[in-house]
């Protein structure tokens, strides 16, 4: 590689600066003599050699990441990934690269969810804000401010008219999502970080889970706490309600998942097989029943397991799928190299997508119990994922402070 005269002079000055600032006086003197440099050190060369050196390493890392992405994209082309036209929507899965990478949050993203009706999505963050985006154009719409600490979870009611959020500031807030986008109620009652919230399908109650080891039910109309469910021995990480509304599930640092009857305070079943904190859960849609039954094994008579079925992701790096009616783990999915932080079923029921601290999103073929696609999604831990029920989109959030929109095809 040939340097121009000017580049050579600048390099010599930078070397001289490096030798001088690091105390190599004899070498500096000899170098100055041989390179014919003046003794006047110019300020602009201060620390230049180190800067160039570190930027080369940074660029090298970036090049390697881009090469990995390129290889992935080429593989897609070579394998002749069927186009949208050749596949049914039930077979569309998220594919790289992302359609949009949305920035604006000033801290880790804790949750991403789609609006049930409009072309909107919502992200919650440790920066204490909730942001609303148009996922079809990638445009930022607005921020909801009111929490004073990390927003841990957000959820819509079935019509998408109300949004509920919970925070490490111990509060739960209800927001009008039709016109004013104002906070219409704030509910207090938990003694520690509120980690998760969910509406019951009818929309008249909200459930919340907390680090205080309890789950509470709140009446939307009044904001009063009407029930407290106890049983978990440690931090309750997530609460998710079954679509029919009669059951809800929670998972905890105590390594268990509990399924509760909504209208009583009774725990229907406790699921224990994970070897570490259970971070996330997701109810399987009815469409997933046949794939899960097939995966459950040869001894399983066709349609033997009636469900409902629940998926769970843990810090033990595994994903498990359970038949809640009998309290049985039907299958275990292995592949992530770190904590599993988010789960979402494909609305068609054939696939499950997961987000992990290994920075990837994985697409699991349920019927064959295998990972069929890995997306190197973020620069840091992936914390949350959602699959749109009607449009071919997946969204993910990360500790890298970005929200990404992935198109399925």
Swiss-Prot record:
- Return the GO cellular component terms, semicolon-separated: centrosome; cytoplasm; microtubule; microtubule associated complex
Q: What is known of its domains?
A: Dimerization mediated by the LisH domain may be required to activate dynein.
User: Which InterPro entries does its entry note?
Assistant: Dynein_regulator_LIS1 (IPR017252), G-protein_beta_WD-40_rep (IPR020472), LIS1_N (IPR037190), LisH (IPR006594), PAC1-like_LisH-like_dom (IPR056795), WD40/YVTN_repeat-like_dom_sf (IPR015943), WD40_repeat_CS (IPR019775), WD40_repeat_dom_sf (IPR036322)
Family, as annotated: Belongs to the WD repeat LIS1/nudF family.
State where the protein is found.
Answer: Cytoplasm, Cytoskeleton; Cytoplasm, Cytoskeleton, Microtubule organizing center, Centrosome
Positions annotated as WD repeat: 104-145, 146-185, 189-228, 231-270, 273-332, 335-374, 377-409
A Gene Ontology biological process annotation? Answer: establishment of mitotic spindle orientation
Keyword Protein transport in record: no
Q: What is this protein called?
A: Lissencephaly-1 homolog
Known function: Positively regulates the activity of the minus-end directed microtubule motor protein dynein. May enhance dynein-mediated microtubule sliding by targeting dynein to the microtubule plus end. Required for several dynein- and microtubule-dependent processes.
The protein's predominant localisation is: cytoplasm
| GO molecular function, a single term | dynein complex binding
Annotated SMART domains: LisH (SM00667), WD40 (SM00320)
Q: Key word Chloroplast present in the record?
A: no
Q: List the disulfide bonds.
A: none
* Matches recorded under PANTHER family: WD REPEAT-CONTAINING PROTEIN POP1 (PTHR44129)
Task: Name all LisH domain ranges.
Answer: 7-39
Which organism is the protein's source? Drosophila willistoni
Q: Which residues form a coiled coil?
A: 54-81
């Amino acid at each position: 590689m040939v340097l121009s005269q000017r580049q050579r002079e600048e390099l010599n000055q930078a070397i001289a600066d490096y030798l001088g600032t690091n105390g190599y006086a004899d070498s500096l003197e000899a170098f100055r003599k041989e390179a014919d440099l003046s003794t006047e050190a110019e300020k602009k060369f201060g620390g230049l050699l180190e800067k160039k050196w570190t930027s080369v390493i940074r660029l090298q890392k970036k090049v390697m990441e881009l090469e990995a992405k390129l290889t992935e994209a080429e593989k897609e082309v070579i394998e002749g990934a069927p186009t949208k036209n050749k596949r049914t929507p039930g077979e569309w899965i998220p594919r790289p690269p992302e359609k949009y990478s949305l920035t604006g949050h000033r801290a880790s993203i804790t949750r991403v969810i789609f609006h049930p009706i409009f072309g909107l999505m919502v992200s919650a963050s440790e920066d204490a804000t909730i942001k609303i985006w148009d996922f079809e154009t990638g445009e930022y719409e607005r921020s909801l401010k009111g929490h004073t600490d990390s927003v841990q979870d957000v959820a819509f009611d079935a019509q998408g008219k109300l949004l509920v959020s919970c925070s490490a500031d111990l509060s739960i807030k209800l927001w009008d999502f039709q016109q004013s986008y104002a906070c219409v109620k704030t509910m207090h009652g938990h003694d520690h970080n509120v980690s998760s919230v969910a509406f019951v399908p009818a929309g008249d109650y909200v459930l919340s889970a907390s680090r205080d080891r309890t789950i509470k039910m709140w009446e939307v109309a009044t904001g009063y706490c009407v029930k407290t469910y106890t049983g978990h021995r440690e931090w309750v990480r997530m609460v998710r309600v079954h679509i029919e509304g009669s059951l809800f599930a929670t998972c905890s640092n105590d390594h268990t998942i509990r399924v509760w009857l909504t209208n009583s305070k009774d725990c229907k079943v406790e699921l224990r097989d994970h070897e570490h904190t259970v971070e996330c859960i997701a109810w399987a849609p009815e469409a997933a029943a046949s794939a899960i039954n097939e995966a459950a094994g040869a001894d399983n008579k066709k349609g033997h397991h009636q469900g409902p079925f629940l998926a769970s992701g843990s810090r033990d790096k595994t994903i498990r799928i359970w038949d809640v009616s009998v309290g049985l783990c039907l299958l275990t999915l292995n592949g992530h190299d770190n904590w599993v932080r988010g789960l979402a079923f494909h609305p068609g029921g054939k696939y499950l997508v997961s987000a992990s601290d290994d920075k990837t999103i994985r697409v699991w073929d349920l019927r064959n119990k295998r990972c069929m696609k890995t997306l190197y999604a973020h620069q840091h831990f992936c914390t949350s994922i959602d699959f749109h029920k009607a449009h071919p989109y997946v969204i993910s959030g990360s500790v890298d402070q970005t929200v990404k929109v992935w198109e399925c095809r």
